[in-house]
Amino acid sequence: MKNAYLGFGRKYKLLLVLCDEFCKDYKTRVDVDRTIHSLLRYQTLRRDLSLFVCRNYKVRDITLAEPDQSFAEKFTAYLKHVRGLADTTVSVEIKSLKHIVKKAFNNGQIDKNPFAYYYYVAEQPEIEYLTEDEINKLIIGKVKQQRQDRTRDMFLFCCFTGLSYADLAKLNYEELKQTPDGEWWISSIRQKTKVAFTVKLLPVAKAILEKYRIPTNRFNRLFSGNPDRVFPVASLKSSDACLKQIVRQCGIAKNLKFHCARHTFATTVTLMNGIPLETVSKMLGHKYTTTTQIYAKVTNQMIGNAISRIEDQIGEQFQFPTQKKEAVG
């Protein structure tokens, strides 16, 4: 086994070479049927694998010779305890590794898939979202810089549409549809899953849209690099850093990231207001309602709202006879 790992004896496929070939092919498909964010994920995996192999095996690359899960187990431990990555990030890297190796096996590049029966399931993190009161604090709160104001607007737009950062950044005017009665809708395809979704613009979202449109022109020209883009969106890293400053200034005691806007739409804006789970799932562009259930945590407020909606109706349909108490003495 040691000889196989170090590449002695029979000629075996090298793991990092396999990753390089995969990334090279993947890069040619970016903006066709793959995204740059996914490519970066695989490139990050390749970097972490290189560091791990050098640290643990004292070589620049290793071969995939025999089915052996110990490598995957050690790599998982390295990501968690040496790199200090979060559970969900570790899970993503392991899935990416398994995908590359499985593809090589299916294409006949390697004889066996050493990670076929290895699984790592991350604990589901607590979903962070804004309450109704916190949304109002964010809307009326004072911010110090123009970029903070713009980042807040972008975050709030996603709170009231359910868009992810990636879908907001690519949003163009072809995806904005106006019905004969004057209502605006977003009709697009999710960049991550390629699933079609449609969502109506609520008043706050419409107000933000109008704010970034030039009055004399139907199309927003703020985005000089691509004039068809609806909003001038900063990078995700910059937006997340800016959000930390904004919530402090608005008196919100939460460590927000941009994706919390999508969680807020799923919980506070829709499910807590009685929108059925299946409908929310369609608006979010989820393939399965089970994904929506993870985003939309049931809270006591949701339970109370649901009961309140049927309380009067049940009271009219079913009446239990009351008895008068007899006087004592």
Where on the chain are the PLM-derived regions?
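Basic, Lys/Arg- and aromatic-enriched nucleic-acid-binding interface segment
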Residues: D87, S91, I110, F115-Y165
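Conserved tyrosine-mediated DNA breakage-rejoining catalytic core shared by Y-recombinases
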Residues: P125-E128, E134, K170-E210
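Short, polar N-cap/turn motifs at the start of nucleic acid-interacting alpha helices
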Residues: E175-D181, A253-K254, G274-I294, N305, ...
